[in-house]
Amino acid sequence: MTDPIADYLTRLRNAIMANHRVVEVPASNLKKEITKILFEKGYILNYKFVEDGPQGTIKVALKYDPATKANAIKCLKRVSTPGLRKYTGYKNMPRVINGLGIAILSTSQGVMTDKEASQLKIGGEVLCSVY
């Protein structure tokens, strides 16, 4: 697999489109950090790391509105790909839907959102955008 982050986002998108409550994805440190950010920002209901085998899996519980059955995640988009890396400085962070969504960056200080990176005045690789 050439792009495990794109595979992770695609698994989440497919589970959302199929109205699944829980999705299991192969674990990695980067996927754990992205999942943690999605949980902290309220895009997913819960997550759990399961150590089964050499790699382990992450069980992600997706968040739906009980009244309308609408998902909290409207769009998951991969920005930087292995063939075309996208980097940004702290002065020109990408704005996702005028600040309503988040961009997830990989920086020298770790994986964080665009707002956190702007406050710390550091740039990095834009992994994905979520709204």
PLM regions: where:
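Core subunits and conserved enzymes of cellular information-processing
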Residues: 1-131
